[in-house]
């Protein structure tokens, strides 16, 4: 039995949420958002933050009705019944497992590049991948208290690194007195055309989606709610607070980058793109180390969330019962090992080609962002299929915000570049991206159908 003192308190939940959300995105990919949106990039991040905050408050509202581990799985099961819960649990577990693998590959490739090794070598990536996962296994094996300590340390490290970018940028700006924010308007490509295209509605939507990916992760925080103190009280307060802190840090980082050297962040080929805005080598090294800490931290967070989805399904008798057993250190070892196997072997089977896996993970999130808000409305109306906790009902968080979240999600899906994501441009035209198509089929159809038949056979 786990002591309550070993469980995550309010501030540890806040730090876990920050650790789950801030990963490699803000360090590696702000250039793509700036390249799409130009001087409107801070506005894009603000819109993405508002959307993330709406969804975070909606998921937090679900957490006050359902405090079982499993997050989206448990919410869907309570709102719609066993079948929807099972489907949500399987696709969420699969995509989260493989997404963890993607994040692991990101850490290894970045580490290899920073230290001058070949980051494209299959052998180098594989060995680095195995070592990283072994370290994370040891961290989890030592129990909840040690994992919490590592997670909190990683969170503080990444916030310090981002804080360093902002402080150093402000100092550079004050020393030079020059604001390069509008230099983007005059940048030219090699063909003489403007480097930043004119912003259209479709372009704005794709930029918001790209920026929004930097905020994803909040939906997984409640996966381990049974390992938290008073989750029904702490989760609805901790998740929105984490989103607010992250939004301020992200927008501050982008504003600093665009004021100092926006051209560098768009044109750079460096692994940690945000370092391109600075000239000082020592400063770049510090930021690169912060990026590695950030990416390692989000891997630790993923190792906490993801296995608990499968464990939660076992506790609800929708997966084999041996998956619900824990070690004497209160570690769900069997779900963890299955998660670890998926995280290692799926990316390896795709030769570390991440395109299909990233698309799969994104599509499952969009699926969640429609199903769960509608489920919260069912909780509010008392239309849930399974019993939920008696919670204080709030029309703003339980009805209005879920409706707005669903509407915005559908709008993003409508404007989503489906051809670009599921097609590959060649000299002969656009051909199907079979990696992406097969990945979607496995995650949404083959795996759920296979596990459903296995479960029915076991029960019979």
Regions found by a protein language model. Give the residues of each.
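Membrane-interface loop-to-helix entry segments
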Residues: 111, 124-182, 239-244, 361-372, ...
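Hydrophobic transmembrane alpha-helices that form the core helical bundles
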Residues: 32-35, 44, 54-133, 137-141, ...
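C-terminal membrane-solvent junction of multi-pass transporters and transport-like membrane proteins
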Residues: 322-331, 369-437
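Membrane-interface "cap" regions at the ends of multi-pass membrane proteins
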Residues: 1-31, 35-40, 53, 57, ...
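Transmembrane helix-loop boundary segments of multi-pass membrane transporters
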Residues: 31-37, 41-42, 114-125, 145-155, ...
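TM-loop-TM module centered on a large, flexible mid-protein loop between adjacent transmembrane helices
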Residues: 74-75, 81, 113-118, 185-195, ...
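Helix-loop-helix junctions that connect adjacent transmembrane segments
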Residues: 3-6, 41-42, 118-124, 156-284
């Amino acid at each position: 039995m786990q002591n309550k003192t070993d469980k995550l308190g309010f501030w540890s939940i806040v730090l876990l949420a920050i650790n789950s959300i801030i990963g490699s995105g803000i360090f590696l990919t702000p250039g793509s958002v700036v390249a799409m949106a130009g001087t409107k990039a801070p506005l894009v991040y603000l819109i993405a933050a508002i959307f993330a905050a709406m969804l975070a408050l909606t998921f937090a509202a679900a957490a006050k009705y359902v405090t079982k581990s499993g997050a989206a799985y448990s919410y869907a099961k309570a709102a719609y019944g066993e079948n929807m819960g099972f489907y949500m649990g399987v696709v969420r577990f699969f995509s989260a497992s493989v997404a963890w693998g993607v994040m692991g590959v990101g850490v290894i490739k970045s580490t290899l590049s920073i230290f001058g090794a070949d980051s494209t070598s299959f052998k180098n990536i594989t060995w680095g991948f195995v070592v990283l996962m072994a370290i994370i296994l040891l961290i989890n094996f030592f129990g909840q208290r040690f994992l919490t300590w590592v997670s909190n340390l990683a969170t503080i490290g990444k916030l310090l690194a981002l804080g360093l970018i902002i402080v150093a940028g402000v100092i550079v700006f004050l020393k030079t007195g020059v604001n390069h924010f509008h230099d983007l308007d005059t940048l030219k490509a090699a063909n003489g055309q403007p480097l930043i295209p004119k912003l259209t509605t479709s372009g704005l939507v794709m930029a918001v989606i790209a920026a929004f990916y930097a905020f994803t992760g909040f939906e997984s925080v409640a996966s381990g709610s049974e390992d938290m103190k008073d989750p029904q009280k702490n989760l609805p307060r901790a998740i929105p607070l984490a989103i607010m802190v992250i939004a301020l840090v992200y927008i501050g980082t982008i504003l600093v980058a665009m004021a100092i050297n926006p051209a560098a962040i768009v044109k750079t080929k460096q692994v940690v793109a945000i370092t391109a805005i600075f000239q000082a080598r020592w400063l770049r090294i510090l930021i690169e180390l912060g990026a590695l800490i950030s990416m390692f931290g989000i891997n630790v967070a993923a190792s906490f969330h993801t296995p608990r989805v499968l464990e939660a399904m076992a506790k609800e008798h929708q997966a084999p019962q041996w998956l619900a057993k824990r070690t004497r250190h209160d570690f769900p070892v069997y779900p963890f090992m299955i998660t670890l196997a998926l995280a290692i072997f799926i990316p390896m089977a795709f030769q570390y080609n991440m395109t299909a896996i990233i698309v799969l993970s994104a599509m499952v999130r969009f699926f969640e962002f429609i199903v769960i808000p509608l489920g919260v409305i069912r909780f509010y109306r008392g239309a849930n299929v399974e019993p939920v906790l008696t919670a204080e009902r709030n029309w703003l968080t339980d009805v209005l915000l879920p409706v707005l979240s669903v509407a915005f999600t559908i709008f993003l899906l409508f404007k989503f570049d489906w051809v670009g994501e599921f097609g590959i441009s060649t000299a002969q035209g656009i051909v199907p991206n079979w990696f992406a198509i097969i990945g979607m089929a496995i995650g949404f159809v083959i795996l759920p159908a296979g596990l459903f038949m296995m479960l029915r056979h076991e029960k019979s």
